[in-house]
Amino acid sequence: MASITLTPSEKDIQAFLEHYQTSLAPSKNPYIRYFLKLPQATVSIYTSGKILLQGEGAEKYASFFGYQAVEQTSGQNLPLIGTDEVGNGSYFGGLAVVAAFVTPDQHDFLRKLGVGDSKTLTDQKIRQIAPILKEKIQHQALLLSPSKYNEVIGDRYNAVSVKVALHNQAIYLLLQKGVQPEKIVIDAFTSAKNYDKYLAQEANRFSNPISLEEKAEGKYLAVAVSSVIARDLFLENLENLGRELGYQLPSGAGTASDKVASQILQAYGMQGLSFCAKLHFKNTEKAKKRLER
């Protein structure tokens, strides 16, 4: 999904609104002055003066403000915040979310270091470069432990809304450190509509517009940095949990997880499983059935 952020003059904003006034729609986001639903695009006009255009027709409507596609360089030449999460697809281990602030002058350093999407790097490479990234790059890391995850899922949150809460909090805390991004990109895990819906229940908010983009870790180094740090945090948590229980906990949610889960269930009961795993996964029932054989 195309996403374009602009900061036009107030005169141009008013001209745009007058031209597309029939497309105005309500928005629950308190930082959005005007929201328009247009054919193949949505337009959010923020109180800060920035405009976020999203959808296949984003470039078409952005041209109203003088935007030209050839000028777009995937946002890499901007100081930006990128976020990503790791652990949402793994039965064992917590959920790690990281927001990282990267400026253009850091790009060469990051490329030479071999920064890329954590899914394309070996765990050994991640454990090697993550400490360097943590030291050199301004970031905010959050880890929701399995026990805390199980406590909030089904009560206040579901598997999607809990990620919205963590991404929002990571960005909020990073902004509190004084960074000034010209763009904020989230590696999309849900639609913009769903994100805004769940965001409404969060107390900590900020006025900066955000962009949810699929496969953002391959487009933005800031997202790639977050992906690496989050993967490192997840792996460290997985090791620590396994060490406390005396088991090597596998990543993912396959049959290996079912087998280890049944062993932990037999040794420690549901309390032990709740300590190290996300109980709403189907692996929990599969582990129980293994013990019944």
From Swiss-Prot:
Keywords: Cytoplasm, Endonuclease, Hydrolase, Magnesium, Metal-binding, Nuclease. One of its GO terms (biological process) is mismatch repair. It catalyses: Endonucleolytic cleavage to 5'-phosphomonoester. Residues 78-293 form the RNase H type-2 domain. CDD domains: RNase_HII_bacteria_HIII_like (cd06590), RNAse_HIII_N (cd14796). GO terms for molecular function: magnesium ion binding; RNA binding; RNA-DNA hybrid ribonuclease activity. InterPro entries: RNase_HII/HIII, RNase_HII/HIII_dom, RNase_HIII, RNase_HIII_N, RNaseH-like_sf, RNaseH_sf, TBP_dom_sf. Its EC number is 3.1.26.4. Manganese or magnesium. Binds 1 divalent metal ion per monomer in the absence of substrate. May bind a second metal ion after substrate binding. GO terms for cellular component: cytoplasm; ribonuclease H2 complex. It is found in: Cytoplasm. Endonuclease that specifically degrades the RNA of RNA-DNA hybrids. This is Ribonuclease HIII. It comes from Streptococcus pneumoniae (strain JJA). The gene is rnhC.
